[in-house]
Amino acid sequence: MIIFATEVQTINSFVRLESFKEVYGLIWGFLPIFSLVVGIVTGVLVLVWLEREISARIQQRIGPEYAGALGILQALADGIKLLFKENLRPSRGNTTLFSIGPSLAVISILLSYSVIPFSNHLVLADFNIGIFLWIAISSIAPIGLLMSGYGSNNKYSFLGGLRAAAQSISYEIPLTLCLLSISLLSNSLSTVDIVEAQSKYGFWGWNLWRQPIGFIIFLISSLAECERLPFDLPEAEEELVAGYQTEYSGIKFGLFYVASYLNLLISSLFVTVLYLGGWNISLPYISSLELFERDPIFGTTIGIFITLAKTYLFLFISITTRWTLLRLRMDQLLNFGWKFLLPISLGNLLLTTSFQVFSL
């Protein structure tokens, strides 16, 4: 069989075209993940700057102002400083657990962002069980904190790790029961379906009005999961120095610092998605679906802006709560979770189930 030169060139060009298609496929596959990571990093930097500015205003002081315009680059400067600091390891601790703990906490929180719909058709992974996936992934983070406390070979670190695990278990159950109530109202476990179910009746169709008790319980439980005041028992400075972070320095300490803000941001995003209508505008005579049908790019941009606006509104509430309420004792924290929030969330679930079964 004789192959002419033109046929060889055709075969070579076809091979190059197929290789280019594979490269383009890889690029388009990683582009959404890269965009999400860039967006998360930017969101955390803005969140840190907002907390410092709001905290400064509450305490009647100036706050950061030298690193960039209005001090907006102060968080980036702190991150670079921690990046070049020495990583110390406890001489008698378990170095494996000590090193894995921070990474496990950060990775488990980052994976939770994959099920967040930032706008219509703008979600990294639209699973049918997206809510359960978030609960399962978020349950891994306390394991990393417990590993960090145990691997540090320090009594304060170990007590902080135990407190983090106990606190997470105590408030994970009421939070899950609230999510089940939302899924019953929406007839779905998908975050996208939950947002679309709230878009039928506009502003009054938000789950905030249909589940006010569940919203309050979810708000309290999410603050406890984020270990924010008044629930910052695992790292109480007056009692445990810095809790499970006591022996950490450098980039590992920075990972814990980032993890706390990542957790706060993901909790606020879930409040927006589950209770505040997600990307829906909820204004009279303006429909989100009409915007997407007219101009998909403009509609997606507006949806992202609305989602982030609702998210940062909730973050403002979380930040002001930090400087308003006093820290609870450990026994008060556990009693509040097991004896108060759990029965109320269970009753709310039973009431929601009754309404759905009898179509009241």
Swiss-Prot record:
One of its GO terms (biological process) is photosynthesis, light reaction. InterPro entries: NADH_UbQ_OxRdtase_su1/FPO, NADH_UbQ_OxRdtase_su1_CS. The chain crosses the membrane at residues 30-50, 98-118, 127-147, 165-185, 203-223, 253-273, 297-317, 340-360. It is an enzyme of class 7 (translocase). It holds the Pfam family NADHdh. It is found in: Plastid, Chloroplast thylakoid membrane. Its EC number is 7.1.1.-. GO terms for molecular function: NADH dehydrogenase activity; oxidoreductase activity, acting on NAD(P)H, quinone or similar compound as acceptor; quinone binding. It is a multi-pass membrane protein. Keywords: Chloroplast, Membrane, NAD, NADP, Plastid, Plastoquinone, Quinone, Thylakoid, Translocase, Transmembrane, Transmembrane helix. One of its GO terms (cellular component) is chloroplast thylakoid membrane. It catalyses: a plastoquinone + NADH + (n+1) H(+)(in) = a plastoquinol + NAD(+) + n H(+)(out); a plastoquinone + NADPH + (n+1) H(+)(in) = a plastoquinol + NADP(+) + n H(+)(out). Belongs to the complex I subunit 1 family. HAMAP family: NDH1_NuoH (MF_01350). NDH is composed of at least 16 different subunits, 5 of which are encoded in the nucleus. NDH shuttles electrons from NAD(P)H:plastoquinone, via FMN and iron-sulfur (Fe-S) centers, to quinones in the photosynthetic chain and possibly in a chloroplast respiratory chain. The immediate electron acceptor for the enzyme in this species is believed to be plastoquinone. Couples the redox reaction to proton translocation, and thus conserves the redox energy in a proton gradient. This is NAD(P)H-quinone oxidoreductase subunit 1, chloroplastic. The gene is ndhA.
